[in-house]
C-alpha cells in the first residue's frame, strides 16, 4: 500500500511537471522591423498586405520643414510592437519571395493601426480593406495627412527616373 502511494505521488508530480512545461513555455521571437510595412520574423521576411508606407529615405513637408516620414513610419511600427509577440496570417508570396501577410499584436492589425496613424496608405491596387482607416486619418489630418507628401508608389517611381 505504501509503495502505491509513492508511485501515485510520483506520477502526479511528473504529470504536473509535464503540464507546466508544455503550457508555460517562454515564447521567443526573432523580430526586426525593416521599415513601415516590412518585418523579419524568425528568419522570414514579411511584407504587410493591403498597405504601403513611405520609404525610409522619403521625407514630407510640414509647414515648409522636412519631416522624415519614412523613418517615422518605421518608428511607429516598432513602438506598437514593443516587446509583444507578433502573429501573422500569410496570404502568399510576392515576386521578391517575401511572405505577404497581415500581422497582429494583441489581436490588433498592425496594418490598420499604421493606416489610422496616418503613416501608411491603403494600397487600393491590391486591397480595399484599409480604405476606412485611411479615410479616418485623412479626415482628421493625422500623420502624413497634415503634411505635403508624395504617395510611396509615386516616390518610388520618381526615384527610378
Where are the predicted features?
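Small beta-barrel nucleic-acid-binding modules, primarily SNase/OB-fold domains
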Residues: 1-161
Amino acid at each position: 500500500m505504501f509503495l502505491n502511494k509513492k508511485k501515485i505521488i510520483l506520477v502526479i508530480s511528473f504529470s504536473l511537471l509535464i503540464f507546466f512545461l508544455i503550457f508555460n513555455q517562454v515564447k521567443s521571437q526573432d523580430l526586426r522591423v525593416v521599415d513601415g510595412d516590412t518585418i523579419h520574423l524568425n528568419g522570414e521576411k514579411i511584407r504587410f498586405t493591403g498597405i504601403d508606407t513611405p520609404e525610409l529615405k522619403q521625407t514630407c513637408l510640414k509647414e515648409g520643414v522636412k519631416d522624415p516620414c519614412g523613418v517615422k513610419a518605421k518608428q511607429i511600427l516598432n513602438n506598437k510592437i514593443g516587446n509583444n509577440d507578433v502573429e501573422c496570417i500569410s496570404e502568399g508570396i510576392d515576386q521578391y519571395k517575401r511572405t505577404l501577410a497581415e500581422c497582429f499584436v494583441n489581436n490588433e492589425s498592425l496594418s490598420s493601426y499604421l493606416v489610422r496613424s496616418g503613416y501608411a496608405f491603403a494600397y487600393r491596387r491590391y486591397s480595399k480593406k484599409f480604405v476606412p482607416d485611411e479615410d479616418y486619418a485623412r479626415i482628421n489630418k493625422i500623420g502624413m495627412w497634415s503634411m505635403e507628401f508624395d504617395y510611396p508608389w509615386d516616390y518610388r517611381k520618381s526615384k527610378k527616373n
